[in-house]
Amino acid sequence: PDHHHAYNALGYSLADRSLRLPEAHSLIKKALELAPGDPFITDSLGWVEYRLGNRDEALRLLRRAYAARPDTEIAAHLGEVLWTTGARDEARRIWREGRERDAGNEVLRETLTRLQVKL
């Protein structure tokens, strides 16, 4: 079936748990083929690239997703990749922007807690 949301949701849920990453990557790529330019799918692809250890590609994709749609969950993902590459000031700035938009976002809160970051 050509249901990009379903491919993306399944791929993202696998990637977020670091499960079956090659399968997650394939599912998300399929979703992006069906809905090119969708920032949420681009975010998912960036997230799976990060989980696969491809930080440069992850950063490129997550920056693109965030520029297209500055969503708090995308901010959480972009900030984490920035943080792990040493761009900590930029990560904090992105996270603060995300918090201003949605202070109660669970993904952002979990990310900051796991990385032990205080904003």
Locate each region found by the language model.
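Residue-level recognition of tetratricopeptide repeat
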Residues: 3, 12-13, 38, 47, 71-72, 80, 105, 114
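TPR alpha-solenoid repeat register
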Residues: 6, 41, 74-75, 108
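Conserved positions within tetratricopeptide repeat
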Residues: 7, 25, 59, 89-92, ...
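Specific register positions within alpha-helical solenoid repeats of the TPR/Sel1-like families, i.e.
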Residues: 15-16, 50, 83, 117
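Structural signature of tandem alpha-helical TPR/SEL1-like repeats
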Residues: 17-30, 52-64, 86-94
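Structural marker of alpha-solenoid helical repeat scaffolds
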Residues: 34, 67-68, 101
